[in-house]
From Swiss-Prot:
Residues reported in the UniProt entry to bind NADP(+): 108-131, 216-239
HAMAP family per the UniProt record, alphabetical: GMP_reduct_type1
PANTHER family: GMP REDUCTASE (PTHR43170:SF5)
Gene3D superfamilies associated with the record: Aldolase class I
PROSITE patterns: IMP_DH_GMP_RED
Family note: Belongs to the IMPDH/GMPR family. GuaC type 1 subfamily.
Organism: Escherichia coli O139:H28 (strain E24377A / ETEC)
Name used for this protein in its record: GMP reductase
Amino acid sequence: MRIEEDLKLGFKDVLIRPKRSTLKSRSDVELERQFTFKHSGQSWSGVPIIAANMDTVGTFSMASALASFDILTAVHKHYSVEEWQAFINNSSADVLKHVMVSTGTSDADFEKTKQILDLNPALNFVCIDVANGYSEHFVQFVAKAREAWPTKTICAGNVVTGEMCEELILSGADIVKVGIGPGSVCTTRVKTGVGYPQLSAVIECADAAHGLGGMIVSDGGCTTPGDVAKAFGGGADFVMLGGMLAGHEESGGRIIEENGEKFMLFYGMSSESAMKRHVGGVAEYRAAEGKTVKLPLRGPVENTARDILGGLRSACTYVGASRLKELTKRTTFIRVQEQENRIFNNL
C-alpha cells in the first residue's frame, strides 16, 4: 500500500484565469480543429466534441443532428447491423464522417463491428469502450482491432493515468478515452472506491499521449460549458459529453409522464436499467455501477449545442485564444473554493 500526497483536481476545483486579448468578438474564434491520427493516418477536421456512446445519448438521431455542428457522435453498440444499414442508406457522407462505431471487447462485438464497418467506407472511427481499460485483455483487443482495421481511427478507454494511456497508444489506439467515475450517472467511485479527479487525469494523460503523438478525449465530469472549456484547457484533444446531451428529442431515452409533465429516463451503461435492457439483468457476481434519473424533456439538442459552442468561444476570448487549438497554451488554472454565486439557484 502507498499514498500519493499530491492533490488531484476536478473541474469544480479550478477556474481559468483571464488574460489580455486582441480579439474583438466571440465570432472571431475558430472552434474547428484539424487532426491527422498517429496510426490510421486519417485526417479529420471538425469541432472536437463527441456525444457519448450511451444508448440514451449516442443515437442515430443525435448523430444526424450534431453533424450539422461538425460535432462527432459515438453511436452506442446496441444497434443491429440491419439498423446500421438503414441509417447509412438515409444519411449523407457528411453525417457518416461524424460517426464513431462503438464496440465492446467480446468476439461477438468484434464480428459485429467488422460487419458494420464493411457497410460503408465513410465509417472511419471505432470507439472501443470498457469501464476498466487496465486489463490485459483490453490491451490485446486494441492491438487486434488495429491489425484488423489499419486505416480506421481507433478511440479506446477508459483509463486515467499516464502509463496506461501510453500502453494503449503503443498498442494501436489513436485516441485514448480518459475518465473513471466522473459521469453524472456513474456510481463507480462510491461502489468501488476507485477513481481519479477528472482535470488531473486529463492533464496527466494529455502529457503522456502527446509525447507519443497520440491524443485523448476527456470523458465525463462536464456539467456546464465552462467545464468543457476547462477540459480543453487541461490538454484534452476531444471532450465527450453524456449528461449534458441527455434528455433531448434525439437522445433516445424512454419518455414517461407524471402529473402532466413529461420526463426522459437517462441511465449509466453499468446501471441496473442498462443491464436489464441489454443482458437480462445484473449478474449475481457483480454490482450495478450506475444510476437512473428522470430528466425534464429539453427539446431539440441544437439549442444545447449552440450554448456549449457559445461558451467555448467566450472562454477563448477571455484568454486571447483565436483558435480552440490555442486554448490549452493560453490556460492558467487558479484553485478556488467557489465557482458561482448561488443565491438564486433554487428559484
